[in-house]
Amino acid sequence: MNKLLIFFVALLSTNSWGYNSEINKGDWILRSGYTFLLPQFSNDSQIGMARFGMPTFSFSYLMTDNIGIEFLTGLPSEIDIYNKSMGEEAKIASFISLSPNATMQYYFKPKNYDFRPYVGLGLIYSSFHKEKSLGILSGANFKLKKSLDPIFQTGFDYVVNEKISLNLDVRKLKTSSGASVTELHKTIMGPYAPQRIDYEMGMQPLTVSLNFTWLFHNPKKFRERRSLQERVTLKQKRKTIKAIRDI
């Protein structure tokens, strides 16, 4: 019975070497999931935006064992903005946003590789397409200014197995974009309309992403680590067999 118990414990310990979730230089990390954007505007902003979400995809390349560079993009989605003084139902425009971003990431190396926290700092480029004026501004020419802004990131992967992890990612940015409205005489205001209206966005959104993560090891280093693991596993098994024989 004692021999059987020792053998079972040893088998579990050697099986713990069956996969390697540690990240190293040359590895690729792919993430895909859904991102929720929580708009946050400054108090003096005249416009607001409803919360929305979109599918997103990113990939990271590990330049060192701890430092990686990530590129993220999402599927374009239509977004509505409204006049804050008139409420969410008072939509004044809609547009489609493309906001790819790149971040430099630092991956911490905890002893428990099943939990991989990281932080990041990067840039987000926002361009806007198919702008359309709505409501009281219908008929006018509505345009949003492109912007390049800093973005801050934190998150973690929770490892399910060697290839797949669950990911939570949070990003914070402050956009420098603004909006302008011209040709206001074409709206219901007619000849009494001002020549131009400018809006400062003052938006400081927070994004929260829930993702699946796939880890792809550097083939050469993966073979080296696998060979080392096999040698260690073999050594452990020999020690276990010797311990059983000595009982």
Give residue spans per PLM region:
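Sec-dependent N-terminal signal peptides
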Residues: 4-12
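Short loop/turn motifs that connect adjacent beta-strands in outer-membrane beta-barrel proteins
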Residues: 19-27, 66, 109-116, 160-163, ...
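Transmembrane beta-barrel strands of outer-membrane/channel proteins
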Residues: 30-36, 71-75, 119-125, 156, ...
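Gram-negative (and chloroplast) outer-membrane scaffold detector with strong preference
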Residues: 61-135, 203-216
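Predominantly the C-terminal beta-signal and adjacent terminal strand-loop region
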Residues: 78-82, 94, 161-247
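Short glycine/proline- and aromatic-enriched beta-strand/turn motifs that initiate or cap beta-hairpins
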Residues: 17-60, 207-222, 242-247
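Residues that define the transmembrane beta-barrel architecture of outer-membrane proteins
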Residues: 26, 51-55, 94-100, 115, ...
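Outer-membrane beta-barrel translocator domains and adjoining extracellular loop/strand segments
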Residues: 41-50, 80-88, 129-138, 179-186
